[in-house]
């Protein structure tokens, strides 16, 4: 009996003990459980991936909707800004027109006042000149009566 024979017998006994204690069945059961656990984890990972893709698609839709809303808001803001600028331009033009009209009215009033003052001065000068001429050529009493009468006529004609 050689050493190889005894090693073979030890191997046979070892394998017999393994089968006696049902080690291969336990190993198979353990491998089956591990395979089921891995399959469950794969199913869970697949489910989570699909859920993540659904959430991603939902957020992409929301993002697209938000971008569209932002564009609409920007467009509306630009439109309102254009309206405000146009209204401001119209109001400014009206203000300038009103100021010009007011200045023209003031100028016209000043011209009217100047003409009236010049007319009044001319009338007063004419009256005083006529008064001096009449006083020099007519008598004092007759000259005063004539002056009073002329002043009344001039005042009624001017006013």
UniProtKB/Swiss-Prot annotation:
Keywords: ATP synthesis, Cell inner membrane, Cell membrane, CF(0), Hydrogen ion transport, Ion transport, Membrane, Transmembrane, Transmembrane helix, Transport. CDD domains: ATP-synt_Fo_b. Its main location: membrane. GO terms for cellular component: plasma membrane; proton-transporting ATP synthase complex. It holds the Pfam family ATP-synt_B. The keyword Cell inner membrane applies. InterPro entries: ATP_synth_b/b'su_bac/chlpt, ATP_synthase_B_chain. The chain crosses the membrane at residues 5-25. One of its GO terms (molecular function) is proton-transporting ATPase activity, rotational mechanism. It is found in: Cell inner membrane. Coiled coil: none annotated. The keyword Transmembrane helix applies. HAMAP family: ATP_synth_b_bprime. F(1)F(0) ATP synthase produces ATP from ADP in the presence of a proton or sodium gradient. F-type ATPases consist of two structural domains, F(1) containing the extramembraneous catalytic core and F(0) containing the membrane proton channel, linked together by a central stalk and a peripheral stalk. During catalysis, ATP synthesis in the catalytic domain of F(1) is coupled via a rotary mechanism of the central stalk subunits to proton translocation. Component of the F(0) channel, it forms part of the peripheral stalk, linking F(1) to F(0). Belongs to the ATPase B chain family. F-type ATPases have 2 components, F(1) - the catalytic core - and F(0) - the membrane proton channel. F(1) has five subunits: alpha(3), beta(3), gamma(1), delta(1), epsilon(1). F(0) has three main subunits: a(1), b(2) and c(10-14). The alpha and beta chains form an alternating ring which encloses part of the gamma chain. F(1) is attached to F(0) by a central stalk formed by the gamma and epsilon chains, while a peripheral stalk is formed by the delta and b chains. This is ATP synthase subunit b 1. It comes from Bartonella bacilliformis (strain ATCC 35685 / KC583 / Herrer 020/F12,63).
